[in-house]
Structures are given as C-alpha cells and as structure tokens.
C-alpha cells in the first residue's frame, strides 16, 4: 500500500472539506514553552514569552485565557500564535501552551495572528481571530476554527471573512462574537475604519458560518475620532449591556460604554475606564453573573523604567462591580482574594524605619520610610490624608526621597491618582505616565498586589491602577504627606510563599 504523507493528507482534507488541522512544526521557543506546565502568579506569563491581547472565556469551572503569545527575537517568521492559560482561582495557572498556530509562510494570511474571541456552543468551541500579513491583500481578515476540547483545533478557511467595501483592508480585526438573545442571532463586532474614523462594525449570523454586514455598530466618541477602537467586547451584566474597547491612541485606555439595549444608545459615564494606561487590551467575560476584565501590563524595553513601552507583558484580571447607575468599580477577584487568604505566608505589620523631611519645588513634605517589599505579596494600607493628598515613592536609593523617580501621587483636590516616572522634587514640571479618576476622602484604603516589577493598586474598593516599576524590587519605599499634616497609617504585608 502506498503511504500518504501527513502533508498530502492535510492537502486532501482541504480539498475535500476546506478544513485544516491547526498544527505546524514547533519552533524551539514553543517547545520550551510547552515544557513549562504550571505558573503560580498574580500576573502570569510563561518564561521566555509575554502575554498579548487576551481572549477570556469562563466555561466548565475554569477561566480559559487564550492570548497572543509574544516571543521576542524568535526563530520563526510567524508571530503571535494563540496560547492558553487556564485557572480556577486566578493564581494557579495551567499552561496549555500553543493551541492555534500561525502559518510560518511569508505569503500566508496567517503569518501573524491577531486577537479575537472564543465561545462554546453546545459541545463545540469556536474561535474567531485575526489573520495579518502585509505581503497580501487585504492585510487583515477574520478566520474561524473549532475544537471539541479547546486544545486541538481545526481551521475553516472557507469561513474566512474579508473586509467589506466600506471598511479599510489594513484595519479589519479583533472579532468578538456574542449571542444576543433579544435578536435570536449571533453578532460579530470588528475593529475597523470607515471614512477616516475608527469604528466598530457589526456582522450578524444565525449559524456561525454565514455572516451579514450590518454596518457601523459604534461610532468613535473618544477624544481622537481617528483612533482605532481595539479589542471590543459586548456583554449583558446586571441588567445592562456593556461595550468595551481600547483606544489605540492617544490615551490607550480600556474604556466601556453602557446601554439598556444591545444596539444602544451608548452612554459614556463620568468614570468610563477599568484601569489606567498601564493596562491595555482589556476584554470582558462573565462567570456566574459576575463580570471580569482581562488585559496585559506592558513591559518596557531593556527592563528599564526610562525606556519605551513594549507590546505585551503580563496578564492581569480585575473583577468588576456595577453601581445603581451602571458605573463599574475594579476589584481584586474573589477567587484571588481567597488564594491570598489561604496562603501560609507570614503577615507583618509595617512600621517606618525612619521619618524625615523632604524638600520639593512644590511643597515641603514629611516622609516615612519602609523596608523593601517582598517579591510577591499583598500590601494592605489605610492612610489618613487630611489635606491635599499623599505620595508613595518606590525604588529609593538610601534616604533621598526627593530624588525618587517612581511616584504614585494621590491628589485629593482633583480626585485623581497619578503615576509619575520623574523625580519627586520636580514632579510639578513633568507629565504623568498614567492616571485614573477616583474620589479621595479623608482616608485612603489600599490593597496593592506586588509581583517583582509590577504593582497594581486597588483603591477604596473603587478603582484599579496598574504600574510597572523596574527599580522597585529590593529597595526601600516611602509615604509622604504635606509637612504639617498628622501622619496616621496602618500597613500590613502578606508575603506569598
């Protein structure tokens, strides 16, 4: 009997059904990735790669975080295969590694994969994702794959969705598919451009194969109408519809809008973000009537605080709670809180090792210095701010607080928290790297998750603020208040082991 090679078998399969097994030769980087099966972290990534645009879906008792795997300086021409991290508690992650590969061919549309969405319908998982290749036209298109176990996928190139005449072929990506019960149909939201504006288009389907262009779903209402609205999601939560996206420029914020109906009209609330610009590409998902958002905290070139921001980094997830008006607050997920509580690591009460006066160009300050934070832990703090606010400075060299360049500023009068990557003594002459709006009263309640160079501040059970600070580990830090304020603070640190 004549043997049929695997390549010939795949070719026959394509000719017969149009389907393609989602497999390819493994690069050395992917082989290394597959050898790492477990990651225990607040903000996971698999060693040797970084987490790009996540595609979260909760099913069968697990948070399944599909994401674009970023290998820097990899041996392949292709980039951003879709990988999977899964977890029940958002701390102990199983690394399923590569599940949907790129095609390592400069002439194939799937040379570079972009984000999309995954849903489970019956016993079948469906993935829609972006194919990107500047050597072909259109540069971007939407691909479809299915799986019975979420690990082994079959691609369906015959289901490829190309940009319509009204949309820009270089920007047609990030498909998000959702079942809309009121309409008895599936909707696909797509990041694209029309008439020079960044918009979200909508397609509809009743069978997940045949899609119909329904035009502009959401027109750009951000401060720059030509910005792309990336990574959209649409969910029904707490009696309302929520649309989220991340503006590609200039703010790079994961934003949300609220509506009573899936077609809108969409309201932009006073607080319309889930985090600052230290968090990007956030996508929403539901677990048992609870809402979550997953995005990534970027690294910086050369692991330097002064360098440019990279694409991709570490995964981060917040739980979101809605008030009576639909405004969302960002919280530590309950699952992660339980892990922290049950971890046998020690809890220490923190006391200042020294207090001193700090001179700045804007006001004299009093500063309390604290010992270095653990490489992984939770800081719980209550600090009184009787007048204008406070500053938390990290990565101190000796006792020189005024020279500290990593500063989180709580501005009470403006109701804002800022992250400055500039010296405290001249901070009034610099622009903040990121910021969020959050009401600040006489007291600040903080829970800060620390992991190596990452600190995510959860403020007053209201807001999350993600930061990357490479000079923070193994160095003292401080809290500073105006010189004549009374200093009252209670701080505890839980060390994760």
Description of each model-found segment:
Residues 469-497:
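Ligand-recognition surfaces built from glycine- and aromatic
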Residues 1-8:
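Bacterial N-terminal signal peptides that target proteins for export
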Residues 358-421:
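Secretory/extracellular carbohydrate-interaction modules
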Residues 423-445:
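Short, aromatic/His-centered strand-loop micro-motif at the edge of beta-sheets
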Residues 381, 444-467:
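Carbohydrate-binding surfaces in secreted/extracellular proteins
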Residues 270-271, 366-372, 433-438, 467-468:
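Beta-strand-rich interaction surfaces with strong enrichment in secreted/lumenal proteins
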Residues 8-16:
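Bacterial N-terminal signal peptides
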Residues 23-174, 179-225, 236-276, 297-355, ...:
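Beta-rich carbohydrate-recognition and catalytic domains
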């Amino acid at each position: 009997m004549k043997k049929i090679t695997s390549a010939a078998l795949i070719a026959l399969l394509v000719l017969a059904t149009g389907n393609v097994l989602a497999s390819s030769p493994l690069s050395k980087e992917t082989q290394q990735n597959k050898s790492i099966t477990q990651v225990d972290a607040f903000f996971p990534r698999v060693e040797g790669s970084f987490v790009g645009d996540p595609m979260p879906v909760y099913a069968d008792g697990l948070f399944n975080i599909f994401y674009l795997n970023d290998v820097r300086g990899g041996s392949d021409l292709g980039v951003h295969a879709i990988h999977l991290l899964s977890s029940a508690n958002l701390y102990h992650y199983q690394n399923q590694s590569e599940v949907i590969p790129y095609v390592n061919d400069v002439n194939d549309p799937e040379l570079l994969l972009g984000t999309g969405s995954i849903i489970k319908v019956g016993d079948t998982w469906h993935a829609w994702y972006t194919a990107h290749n500047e050597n072909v036209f259109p540069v971007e298109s939407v691909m479809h794959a299915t799986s019975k176990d979420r690990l082994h996928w079959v691609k369906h190139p015959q289901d490829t969705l190309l940009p319509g005449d009204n949309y820009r072929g270089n920007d047609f990506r990030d498909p998000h598919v959702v079942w809309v019960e009121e309409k008895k149909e599936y909707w696909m939201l797509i990041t694209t451009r029309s008439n020079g504006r960044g918009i979200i288009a909508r397609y509809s389907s009743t069978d997940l194969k045949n899609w119909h262009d329904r035009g502009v779903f959401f027109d750009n209402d951000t401060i720059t109408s030509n910005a792309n609205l990336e990574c959209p999601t649409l969910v029904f939560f707490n009696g309302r519809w929520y649309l989220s996206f991340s503006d590609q420029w200039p703010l790079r914020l994961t934003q949300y809008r609220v509506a009573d109906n899936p077609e809108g009209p969409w309201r932009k609330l006073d607080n319309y973000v889930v985090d600052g610009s230290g968090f990007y590409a956030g996508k929403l998902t539901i677990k048992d009537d609870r809402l979550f958002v997953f995005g990534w905290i970027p690294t910086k070139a050369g692991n330097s605080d002064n360098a440019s921001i990279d694409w991709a980094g570490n995964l981060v997830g917040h739980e979101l709670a809605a008030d009576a008006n639909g405004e969302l607050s960002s919280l530590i997920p309950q699952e992660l809180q339980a892990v922290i509580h049950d971890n046998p690591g020690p809890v220490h009460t923190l006391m200042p090792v020294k207090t001193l006066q700090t001179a700045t160009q804007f006001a004299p300050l009093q500063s309390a210095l604290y010992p270095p934070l653990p490489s992984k832990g939770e800081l719980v703090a209550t600090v009184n701010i009787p007048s204008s606010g406070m500053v938390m400075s990290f990565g101190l060299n000796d006792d020189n607080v005024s020279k500290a360049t990593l500063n989180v500023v709580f501005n009470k009068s403006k109701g804002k928290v800022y992250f400055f990557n500039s010296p405290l003594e001249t901070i009034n002459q610099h622009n903040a790297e990121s910021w969020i709006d959050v009401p600040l009263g006489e007291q600040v309640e903080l829970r800060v998750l620390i992991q190596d160079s990452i600190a995510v501040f959860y403020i007053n059970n209201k807001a999350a603020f993600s930061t990357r600070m490479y000079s923070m580990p193994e160095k003292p830090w401080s809290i500073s208040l105006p010189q004549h304020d009374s200093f009252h603070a209670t701080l505890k640190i839980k060390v994760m082991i």
